[in-house]
Amino acid sequence: MKGNPKVIEQLNRALREELTAINQYFVHAEMCENWGYDKLARYIKKQSIGEMKHAESLMERIFFLDATPTMEPLALSIGGNVKDMINSDLKLEIDAVAMYNEAVRIAYENQDNGSRDLFVTLLKDEEDHVDWLEAQTHQMAELGYERYLTTQTSEEE
């Protein structure tokens, strides 16, 4: 099925965002693991895998619309400490929420409800990511940065 070029552009834009998130989260997870923040590392790694599933869904839709995926991620923003990582990831997710809101609008305007439904699903996931990241910044503020870090060293699964 031939897709609308404007919708395909949004699908590829979303794919680039997801590829960036996969890589950024994966690097941050490995850094946290290296520093001994195992609980945080496990959660961030799961986020990376979730973003990979998002990318897969986007590629499937792009191929369904007889288009070619753009596999070039955007520039990564790697934090030098946990606080910077959380802030970098929060900015990435806030940008993704804005991008998905625009993509929903464009898909709707171009009568591509299949793509619109996909964008809505991914938007909800990104909003959940924003919520979790905002909770982390709140915990850092309430507990203090050092105490927050002590809550992230658990090796329990």
Predicted segment positions?
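Iron-associated oxidoreductase/ferritin-like identity signal
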Residues: 1-157
